[in-house]
Amino acid sequence: DFIIMNIASVFNGNQDPGSNKLIDELLSTVIPDVNLNLNPDIIAKVIEYSKVATLIVVVDLNRPAILSSIDNFVDGLVGTFGVSDEVIFKMIFGDFNPTGKLPFEIPKSMNEVLLQKEDLPDDTDLPTYSFGFGLSY
């Protein structure tokens, strides 16, 4: 048994990923949420589900997110960029070999984000996942 949990980085995981890409992009531009932490309710669900079965978390990364709060509780973590549920399931069930590299780093904490230089990308001290991180198989 396993659980697949799909969360979005836009608005701290409170919105269904890809529910309306145009609205996602518009709202995240007009009303950017500077807090990259996941909502505490989402974190609690990840912890709860991790106790029940193997947990694969799929995060739609419209923007970077703080994933260190869930990283130790998941058996698999997949970062996506606006793909459909069908594509996610095909990848998980082995219909194709995924490949990909992060186009930005995933910071460990909001403190790291606040300490980085605005004009220098990927300069946090200890990111959870570095720029270019990714797996292929």
Kindly give the residue locations of the regions a language model identified:
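C-terminal non-catalytic regions of proteins with extracellular/luminal or membrane-system context
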Residues: 1-137
